[in-house]
């Protein structure tokens, strides 16, 4: 890639740096979301805490424009739906 102008070179460096930061944040969100769902399905005590942490990470990513606000809302909604489904399944099972 032939970037001839200094400003273009700098913007390219900055975009690569931002890309790494954004990828890291998105991977962390995915990890905590999966952990929260698995914990809820297994009936773990820390499922609510993991859910809260995942939602917090999603909100922070949306605030910093790593995620679009609508994408963040969608992720939070789907996470809550999955956790509620897991809780309902746990409650339906005989003890």
From Swiss-Prot:
GO terms for molecular function: small ribosomal subunit rRNA binding; structural constituent of ribosome. Residues 80-95 have a biased composition (Low complexity). It comes from the Bacteria. Keywords: Ribonucleoprotein, Ribosomal protein, RNA-binding, rRNA-binding. One of its GO terms (biological process) is translation. Binds directly to 16S ribosomal RNA. NCBIfam families: S20. This is Small ribosomal subunit protein bS20. It comes from Deinococcus geothermalis (strain DSM 11300 / CIP 105573 / AG-3a). The gene is rpsT.
